[in-house]
Amino acid sequence: MRLGRAGIVLGLLFSISSQAQDYHAIEGSPFAGSLGVANNPASILMTPYPWDITVFSLQLKTSTNAVTFHNLSLLHPGDTTEYSFDGGNKRRFAAYNFNLHLLNVRLALSKKAAVAFGTNIRSYAAIRTGVANYNDSLQNMNQFFDINENTTYNANGVSSSWLEAFVTYSRTLWDNETSRLNAGLTLKTMRGISGAFAQLNSGSVERSVSGARTIYLLNAGNARYGYSSNYDRWKNGRSTMDNLKSFLGKTRNGAALDLGAEYLVKTQAVTNYSDEDTYYDYEWKIGVSLLDIGRNTYAFGNQSRTASNPKSNVSDSALDVKFGDPGTLAKFNDSLATIVNNVGGMGGVFNIWNPTRLVINVDRPLQNNFAVNANLSVNLSGSNSGKGKSFFVKEMNLLNLTPRWETRRWGAYLPIQLTTDGKFWVGSAVKAGPLLLGIHNWANVFLKNKMQNGGFYMALIIRPGHGFAEKEDKQYDCPKY
């Protein structure tokens, strides 16, 4: 398989690649509208507008302890940017997520029922290793094995990217003087654009001495890797547009759903019933949702492989020669066949489950347009170390706490988040009319070695100039004089 430059770029975009989906500033906000449906489908009932349209929104987040970028920040995009692999004896990870929302529309049918629909492009990926030692002075595999005596090597990586179209329905289940319960359901039809996985299990080497030299020989382990077959359709000599048509044409359908509910504890203060917005007032709002219950299916590409039972005479120097510059995946596979006793292709299909998770959100309004929101996200996905043909992508976010000041037109937000890998970030966001701009980690702005951990989001949301105009039966209204 040889993709060429455009194919490589496409592969990086789709394969190394995200509640609202990481738009942390507006989680729980009554003004989130169509952008909030991804965090809880019931939330679309708690927006004081008859409609709103997210023309587009874009979110990117990365997190790693394996790589550091140097001389780079949002304030200083230097010309001498470099990167290095982080040293130390530790587990390593790199995770990435991305989403693009296009024309997401929310329509209030009444104050007690609403719908939303739109299209999204989403991409998730993560690579994780077992404990291994590394430093940037290593020159070859012999030196690497030397500082990793008695290490058992394990690693796995999964990526999935897809296009989805969704429709959401939400309605009020009960509404009394003290509380209200809203529930919502989102149905999604998906098209898997790109899928890939890789595994290394129980790899080990055996130390041997030959004269004054220490040699390491392969001892045990098994590996497998696969990718979606549409990459095989990318051909050199064809135009990029023709390749894209062929690439996207060889994809499969999938389906997913979201479930959510929001429970409101109403304010018991005296309210002005002539003010429409008092309908949306609450003391507490508690949301619970199950998100991304579904999967994408991919056919195996021609160069997908499984390998086991290493040959006993393969030395560290042989690995340097055979894999120093593999060039293409086909050449890599040819080299792999010379160092193991069992190697074969992989046929049929594999599944990658979406980042299924339980989300609990609590929102507490304060005085003078201030509020605070807490959001807990718990991944419900399985392990990527198994022997089956089902794999999982996962959400990076674990816990967020977001103080905010917000009106219809303006907003300032301070999301504080803890990731599933223990990263602690302080971000911020601002809303100015239809525009929302945010960053996940302030360190991206000021420090020149933190760009690998963080990201940004932006959204353009169109809303009407006035609030909800309730459509009521006017037959019993008093006549106007």
Task: Give the role of each language-model region.
Residues 21-481:
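Subset of outer-membrane beta-barrel
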